[in-house]
Amino acid sequence: QLRAFVCRLSSVIFYETMYVGIVLLGLIAFDRFLKIIRPLRNIFLKKTVFAKTVSVFIWSFFFFISLPNMILSNKEATPSSVKKCASLKGPLGLKWHQIVNNISQFIFWTVFVLMLVFYVVIAKKVYDSYRKSKSKDRKNNKKLEGKVFVVVAVFFVCFAPFHFTRVPYTYSQTNNKTDCRLQNQLFIAKETTLFLAATNICMDPLIYIFLCKKFTEKLPCMRGRKTIASSQENQSSQTDNITLG
């Protein structure tokens, strides 16, 4: 029964949230791109209302395409059928599952290509800026690089390995000529990279820390650092005043 629950509900929710995360990362990358390349244009895209509307639309879209995958897994669960989630689906369920799979693959590869384009352009812009500054402010340049590239790092660490593995794995499942040993190896690779995709939940806070100032200011450890830094500055200014006096 637990395995049937995984097939009908939890795995569907997992994949739904994974692709929501992929799309949102793509939008964050697009936001970084606009801020660096066109900082004074497209002001309406930066408004909170617009961001909330897009977020609600994305979650609603993935919910409605995922819901039939839960409903159409309606065959009786037996010890043999739950070994493969597709066995719980009828012909309509299998067809819808394939449609959703194709949509998901299209979304990932679209975001993948766009992210490459965005960050190639951003990297060139950052490099040109770094060269013009003649390394006078190396510390700030390093901070900027960290902030700019954290999104693409999370994307490639969490999501790219799974989708690179999923292509040959899916082919091996649909091709009867594939060697059984190779199928098992690809299955292990797919499950391992799927674990990496699940670690995205741990990587998301890095994006908030690097890119969201309001979030960082609310962290107790960061507030402590800020207090220490400000007290050190006050002590330094007091010392300077005493010395000058």
From Swiss-Prot:
Residues 31-35, 107-126, 196-245 are cytoplasmic. The keyword Transmembrane applies. Signal peptide: none annotated. Coiled coil: none annotated. The chain crosses the membrane at residues 10-30, 36-56, 86-106, 127-147, 175-195. Residues 1-9, 57-85, 148-174 are extracellular. Gene3D superfamilies: Rhodopsin 7-helix transmembrane proteins. It is a multi-pass membrane protein. It is found in: Cell membrane. Pfam families: 7tm_1. One of its GO terms (cellular component) is plasma membrane. InterPro entries: GPCR_Rhodpsn, GPCR_Rhodpsn_7TM, P2Y13_rcpt. Disulfide bonds join 7-85. Receptor for ADP. Coupled to G(i)-proteins. May play a role in hematopoiesis and the immune system. Belongs to the G-protein coupled receptor 1 family. This is P2Y purinoceptor 13. It comes from Macaca fascicularis.
